[in-house]
Swiss-Prot record:
Name of the protein this chain belongs to: Large ribosomal subunit protein uL10
Domain of life: Bacteria
A molecular function GO annotation: structural constituent of ribosome
This protein's record includes keyword Membrane: no
A cellular component term, taken from the record's GO annotations: cytosolic large ribosomal subunit
Amino acid sequence: MALNLSQKQEVVAELADIAAKAHSLIAAEYAGITVSQMTAMRKQARETGVFLKVVKNTLAVRAVEGTDFAVAADKLVGPLLYAFSMEEPGAAGRLIKEFAKGNDKLQAKVVSIGGELFPASHVDVLASLPTLDQALAMLARVLSEPAAMFARAVKAVGDKQGGGDEAAAPVAETAEA
């Protein structure tokens, strides 16, 4: 279906707004994917915070002008679907990688994050980025480990000197008095 000028302007404005807020972009060839597969991918994209859209490349090029994804403008050729990660940088990578496992016709062509253009093979790197929850758990573990090591060292010194828990009991009784 052909779009008139005002419809094209709306598509460009919507995509430009999404591109300005997105963390990463993956453009992938989708030729040969069935409607049911595309519907399933769109459903999962909505659930994972990925904006997924098929638009004409000329409209996509206009939409990414002035954003971090402008570096990818000359690579946007052929039948492409655009996956923008809105919540986590790796979400689009995980989505495309997962669906490419089940369908060899879905192939990443452009990977862009933070104003940098990467080869399509970097979709695996992007997919391996931790989610926000995973990153926070890693940070908490890193921050708590020194305190845990100190506590284990103090306990080991107490055990080595023969006191351990028995030596701590008189100190606790003295503190209560």
